[in-house]
Amino acid sequence: MNNDLFPGEEQLSTAKILAVDDEDGDIRALEWVCRMAKFANFRSVNDSARALDVFREFQPDLVLLDLHMPEPDGFAVLKQLRETVPAGDFLPVLVLTGHDTIEMRKRAMKAGANDFLGKPVDYTEVTLRMRNLLQTRFLHRQTQEMQARLKALTAAQEADKPTKSGQKL
C-alpha cells in the first residue's frame, strides 16, 4: 500500500481542533492532550451560544463536544454544526461527556456524532480517536479532490474525441 496516500504526521499536527465545553478544567485537559499529541492548532469555546460563530471563523477539522452544557446544550450545538457543514463534506465530531450511558451514546450517534467517549477520558484513547477521525477527514477530502480531477479529465477527453458530421465516433 502506498503510504503517500495517507495523511502524514505533518498534516495531522496542523489540523484545526475545536473544543466546545463549559467546564474550564475539561478545556485545559483537552488542550494538554492536544499539546502532548503535537496538535498545534487548538481552540476552545466555553460558551455553547458562541460555538457556531467560533466554528465558522476557525473552520476546524475536528470538533470535541461536550453534551451537557447550559442552553444551548451539546445536542443543539451538534444539530447546528450538521446544518452548517456543506453537503458532501465530512466534519468529524467526537462527543465527550460525563453522562456515559448506552442510551446517551445512541442518542449522540443518531444526532450526528462520529464517536463518543465518557469522561474522564484516557489520554491515549482520546488521542488515538482524534487521529483516526482526522485521518478519515483528510482521506475524505483527498478522495473528493481526486474525483473532481477525474471528472475534469473525463470531460476534457470527451471534448477532444473526434467527430464525424457533428456526431462523436
Predicted stretch roles:
Residues 44-62:
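Acidic, metal-coordinating helix/loop segments flanking the phosphotransfer/catalytic sites
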Residues 21, 66, 97:
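Active-site residues of response regulator receiver
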Residues 24-43:
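Two-component/phosphorelay signaling modules centered on CheY-like receiver
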Residues 103, 120-130, 134, 138:
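C-terminal output helix
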Residues 31, 76, 89, 100-115:
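Alpha4 helix (beta4-alpha4-beta5 surface) of REC/receiver domains from two-component response regulators
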Residues 1-18, 141-169:
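Non-catalytic signal-transmission and effector/linker regions of two-component phosphorelay proteins
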Residues 69:
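Receiver (REC) domain active-site loop signature in two-component systems and cognate sites
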Residues 46-50, 73-79:
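Acidic catalytic/metal-coordinating carboxylates
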